[in-house]
A protein has these predicted regions:
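Compositionally biased intrinsically disordered regions enriched in Thr/Gly
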Residues: 4-233
Length: 233
């Protein structure tokens, strides 16, 4: 789980100082392009190498700036203000899971070392409504009770963290879903803004495992038995 300080939400990072742009458009659609940006910072306390996307060529420049600020504060700010005095080393990259004219869904993965301790694997997501220029929460697109009913082994594929050889019965999967709702990948993320991703027809869930239980993640993705239409609002 990543703990977020208030200062990160206020954007106290000079974006222009440490960012290099890779002038290679990826995932282009008719209304915008996605550019790969890199944030690199090396100081006595911090080593950060973070790749993240930015949007270009939107007709609404003000909205484009708002979206890019959201992306930057999530991609970089979560690490920067949390660990600024703790001898942080972090390396993170991203995958564009889905993008079209209306939405973009990004999954971030990387490793963080604090004060020369063992590296921790980090995983979180960011989903943005490109029409509104806002972050999408789980309940904006998914009916939680429908998802609860469909949250069964046959409907999900294990991407990471859960041994498929361990038999979880129906009640076990129910407990795992309750765990997903209770524990958050990002501290205080009651709306589950940062622990899911989606495509046209699939959803991925990132379940945070508490530090005292190993501090890792379980990542599940819906199988062909479960479509987004089955769990949409």
């Amino acid at each position: 789980m990543i703990i977020v300080s208030k200062s990160c939400k206020n954007g106290n990072i000079n974006r222009g100082t440490y960012i290099s742009k890779e002038e290679q458009a990826i995932n282009s659609v008719s209304k915008y392009r996605i550019i790969k940006d890199k944030f690199i910072l090396n100081t006595t306390n911090m080593e950060m190498h973070i790749e993240y996307p930015s949007i270009s060529d939107m007709s609404d420049i003000e909205k484009q700036e708002r979206i890019n600020k959201l992306i930057f504060l999530t991609s970089v700010g979560l690490y920067y203000n949390t660990y600024v005095h703790n001898k942080l080393k972090t390396s993170s990259n991203y995958t564009i899971v889905h993008n079209d004219d209306k939405y973009i869904s990004v999954k971030y993965e990387g490793f963080t070392t604090v004060e020369a301790r063992r590296p921790n694997y980090d995983c979180f997501c960011l989903n943005i409504d490109l029409i509104k220029g806002e972050v999408i929460g789980l309940e904006d697109v998914i009916d939680i009770e429908k998802l609860r009913v469909k949250f069964k082994k046959d409907n999900f594929t294990v991407v990471k963290g859960l041994d498929e050889n361990i038999p979880l019965d129906e009640s076990g999967w129910g407990e795992l879903f309750d765990h997903y709702l209770e524990y958050h990948v990002i501290s205080g993320d009651e709306l589950h803004n940062y622990d899911f991703y989606f495509t046209d027809n699939k959803i991925g869930l990132i379940i945070s495992v508490p530090v005292d239980a190993g501090g890792s993640y379980i990542i599940l993705e819906s199988s062909d038995n479960l479509s987004m239409d089955d769990i949409k609002k």
